[in-house]
A protein has these predicted regions:
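Bacterial N-terminal signal peptides that target proteins for export
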Residues: 1-12, 21
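Intrinsically disordered/low-complexity terminal segments and short unstructured peptides
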Residues: 6, 12-13, 31, 223
């Protein structure tokens, strides 16, 4: 288990995933951003219509998550996967609401730990945490962004985590890194990041890198990491 100085000011809950533990055995997988097919639709007919974390209303469990990450959790075969980035030092606090001037010209100076995390869906207990990279950030980010913005994707056997300029990682169900790819850092529009989460299409893993210099889309063999094609976008 990792111990870091900075902790998310939010908790991961089963209600946030739209899953009731009374339905876990029959619950559908939610393997990618916006669910299966990226449709944003659940076939579960017994979802809670309201919940309150403070009052524990329709909350099965709560688990603190280290670091900062805008990525969504994904679910497959009773496991939850998510990503986070943990700073060794203090970072600028996030502000609510809309405002201008949130882009930053320089990367955050502190060392960051880029994590892939796996939790048990029924209990919320950590099964493993894997640090895939420890590095000072290569690119600036907007004040409302994080260094773990892209949602991972899983096929149940492997989980694929994309941290933009900080790499693409394939891990097995035990947290072992099977392969990784590193990419040239580019200037991003207002520090918003790469613009998309990875997807799986058969044996292909497809990612987008939307930037201000040389935007591209690429496909990799999901088992080996071999690049299959790359094109400008």
């Amino acid at each position: 288990m990792f111990s870091f100085n900075y902790t998310r000011g939010m908790l991961l809950t089963t209600a946030a995933l739209g899953l009731s533990l009374g339905q876990v055995a029959a619950a559908e997988n939610w393997p990618t951003f916006r669910g299966d097919g990226a449709r944003g639709i659940s076939e579960n007919k017994n979802l809670p219509l309201e919940w309150d974390a403070k009052q524990n209303k329709n909350i099965e469990w709560k688990t603190a998550v280290p670091g900062l990450g805008w990525s969504n959790p994904v679910v497959h075969s009773g496991r939850i996967y998510l990503t986070s980035a943990v700073s060794d030092g203090e970072i600028e606090p996030r502000k609510p609401g809309l405002y201008f001037g949130g882009d930053r010209k320089e990367p955050i100076k502190h060392m960051h730990h880029f994590l892939v995390l796996c939790l048990d869906l029924k209990s919320g207990e950590y099964l493993w945490q894997k640090e895939v990279l420890a590095s000072r950030p290569l690119t600036p980010i907007h004040i409302k962004n994080s260094y773990a913005a892209e949602t991972p994707v899983t096929d149940g056997e492997r989980v694929y985590a994309y941290f933009g300029s900080h790499g693409l990682y394939c891990l097995d169900k035990t947290g072992k890194v099977l392969w990784k790819k590193m990419f040239k850092p580019y200037e991003m529009r207002n520090g918003w990041g790469t613009g998309a989460s990875p997807i799986l299409d058969g044996d292909q893993l497809i990612i987008v890198n939307d930037n201000m210099e040389d935007s591209w889309m690429a496909s990799f063999d999901k088992r080996t990491g071999r690049q299959l094609w790359k094109t400008k976008r």
